[in-house]
Amino acid sequence: MENGFLFLDEMLHGVRWDAKYATWDNFTGKPVDGYEVNRIIGTKAVALALREAQIHAAALGYGLLLWDGYRPKSAVDCFLRWAAQPEDNLTKEKYYPNIERAELITKGYVASQSSHSRGSTIDLTLYHLDTGELVSMGSNFDFMDERSHHTAKGIGNAEAQNRRCLRKIMESSGFQSYRFEWWHYKLIDEPYPDTYFNFAVS
């Protein structure tokens, strides 16, 4: 692991995680290149900011559940290769039912570079501290559809309010949202703004 990075659970006591790209449960339908263990890595700076977000969330009765953090460049390349393959319908219904696989790049859901590779971007949601249940957000992680946009129409008032709650928690902790994905937040003062790393999550 590069200097300045760590497993986020080492600093964020009580955080939950489910590193989707290390599993078969993601839009490619298999573990993604570069993810060798089901843990999440980030910069020390993002860990400190997330610790602040944890405090804000806990005051409202919520905990943080992380889906992705640092993403190796090899994983981004794996996504691009997958997006260029003919449709096999293995994951389409769950992740991108309303657009074609070939459109995922042009619509901004799959990119040739990812801020995740700089180590200070996080994909996450909230869960209820008292029950452990995930907070309803109106769409699932990596659902590549307008329902996942911050300005989505067709989600309930409660789900829209929950998204605003997550956004307020994260923005008050130094993060910037991404309009196409309610779960995606980038640390504004990231320590490596021009470096795209490629060490494995191991």
From Swiss-Prot:
Cofactor binding mode and count: Binds 1 zinc ion per subunit.
GO BP terms in the entry: cell wall organization; proteolysis; response to antibiotic
EC number: 3.4.13.22
Record keywords, A-Z: Antibiotic resistance, Cell wall biogenesis/degradation, Dipeptidase, Hydrolase, Metal-binding, Metalloprotease, Protease, Zinc
Residues annotated as transmembrane: none
Marked site positions, Transition state stabilizer: R71
Cofactor(s), by name: Zn(2+)
Induction annotation: By vancomycin, mediated by VanS/VanR.
Catalyses which reaction(s): D-alanyl-D-alanine + H2O = 2 D-alanine
GO function term, MF aspect, one: D-Ala-D-Ala dipeptidase activity
SUPFAM superfamilies linked: Hedgehog/DD-peptidase
Active site positions, chain numbering: E181 (proton donor/acceptor)
Pfam families assigned: Peptidase_M15 (PF01427)
Positions bound to Zn(2+): H116, D123, H184
Top EC category: hydrolase
Matching CDD domains: D-Ala-D-Ala_dipeptidase_VanX
Known role: Catalyzes hydrolysis of the D-alanyl-D-alanine dipeptide.
Family membership noted in the UniProt record: Belongs to the peptidase M15D family.
PANTHER family per UniProt: D-ALANYL-D-ALANINE DIPEPTIDASE
HAMAP family per UniProt: A_A_dipeptidase (MF_01924)
Protein name according to UniProt: D-alanyl-D-alanine dipeptidase
Species of provenance: Enterococcus faecalis (strain ATCC 700802 / V583)
Gene of this entry: vanXB
